[in-house]
């Protein structure tokens, strides 16, 4: 589903942006957890789907 892929890409982009724009407390809380852990979950979920 294209919509699903776009949604996942948006989450990844937002997670990355959070770490870039908020390198302080916000970056560690949102970018660190969302970018590190969320990234693995997204890749793991997207691979079997394809």
UniProtKB/Swiss-Prot annotation:
Q: Which residues form a coiled coil?
A: none
- Transmembrane stretches in the record are none
Q: Which InterPro entries match?
A: Celegans_Fungus-Induced_Rsp, Fungus-induced
Q: Which Pfam families match?
A: Fungus-induced (PF10917)
What is this protein's name? Fungus-induced protein 3
Originating species: Caenorhabditis elegans
């Amino acid at each position: 589903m294209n919509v699903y892929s776009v949604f996942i890409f948006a989450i990844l982009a937002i997670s990355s942006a959070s770490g870039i724009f908020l390198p302080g407390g916000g970056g560690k809380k949102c970018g660190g957890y969302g970018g590190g852990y969320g990234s693995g979950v997204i890749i793991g979920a997207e691979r079997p789907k394809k």
